[in-house]
Amino acid sequence: MKPFMDADFLLQTDTAKTLYHEAAEKMPIFDYHNHLNPQEILEDRQMENLTRVWLGGDHYKWRAMRAMGFSEDLITGNADDYDKYLAFTETIENAIGNPLYHWTHLELQRYFGITTPLSRATAKELWDEANAKLQTKEFTVRNLILNQHVSHLCTTDDPADDLHCHLALQKEDFACRVLPSFRPDRAVHLEKPDFPEYVEKLAAAAGRTIASAEDMVHALSCRLDFFLYAGCVVSDHSLEGCFYVPCTAAEANDVFENRMNGGALTEKELGMYKGFLLTNLGRLYHKHNIAMQLHIKALRNNSKRMFRALGADTGFDSMNDFAFAPMLGAFLNDMDEDDALPKTVLYSLNPGDNPMLASMAGNFAAPSIRSKVQFGTAWWFNDHKYGMESQLATLSSIGMLSTFIGMLTDSRSFLSFPRHEYFRRILCNQIGNWVENGEYPANLEFLKEMVENISYNNAVSYFL
């Protein structure tokens, strides 16, 4: 029997151990997509206890706790922090096979030096030990980031945000660069009930009137310039349903006007406006050399009752299922036709799309950019051991694993950075298996460089 989560955790071969311990383990982290709060980084917040740092905004954990039958008061409600922690402890003890189990114990090991498994029997001991450390200066938010050697992190920000935290952090002596990501979903999804109110908010931020789809593009261009000033290197889009139907500017303007006047829109009209906006934004991204991330197939807010009670991003989303390959290909080609396609990262929440995305990425290449269109890492419901192995196998079979930009946290927790370690161990194990099966030569120096690139260097070259 192997020891529990020791130094060689997930590393099944000697080659895997060499690649991880001599290459991947030492690399810094470029976390190019997360949902961390920049205000908490600026304030260098000190977390009060394990409950606050673990359960403060993590819907992965909330879903698992609901599956265990705990009341919402113990999950997102006003129950005592220690009672919430005990509920989470019982959840984790029962979470065999779930990545939450591994992530939780990697966090205990890497941040707190705790190797004892979390259980109801050890809960009080671990609570006291971890909380005592959380009160020391080494456990402020910034030090949690530096603990894991994070060189860059990209938060997720609305075009109307003032980015005061990012700008203030640039003036401080903080070794990690905290960069904004441009996420204009509220400008794209005109079917949402609050779209008219958002138009007013964005217009105020941009200092210009928005009375048409073309005006919307100009306002977003203005805000993108500001984001670039604040260090932005990447955008992000959540695409749901029909997101591209070719149309003229006049047709997109008509759809916008109809929506602002309270008219009902067809699925085709939604696709026309979204496609017009997205292709124009893509051209702007290309002009300014920033990457475009496309997160596709999240089916959001399925429990309307809980959405009304708790709002969005609280654990009631799932995978969607619809065909979108022709639409995606046409969308990318629209920009590629006049050589204005930006660097693009493709993600689908449904792993059934993996081969399609891997093959789609290979359609659009450019000199001097390694894998200009990337098949993105296993995302959300797929960023577990088997999901990562599947994504890596599909990418290597259809595309080029060596040019892959690697892992991200996609997290709201400042303890989430060991997820990069989790990915790197799985990566090294996969490559190690190929070598020891005789499928690739044991050129360890070359392979170590490849692992270092996938772990960190490729992301630096791609985004900076």
Language-model features and meaning:
Residues F307-G315:
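Short glycine/proline- and charge-enriched loop/turn segments
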Residues F324-L328:
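Divalent-cation-assisted or electrostatically stabilized phosphate/pyrophosphate-binding catalytic cores
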Residues M292-L294:
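C-terminal amphipathic alpha-helical interaction region
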Residues E267, F316-F322:
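A short acidic, glycine-rich active-site loop
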Residues A298, S303:
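Hard-cation-handling environments
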Residues F331-E337:
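Short, basic/hydrophobic alpha-helical segments
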Residues M1-H288, A340-P342, L346-A358, G362-L464:
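Metal-cofactor-binding active-site regions of metalloenzymes
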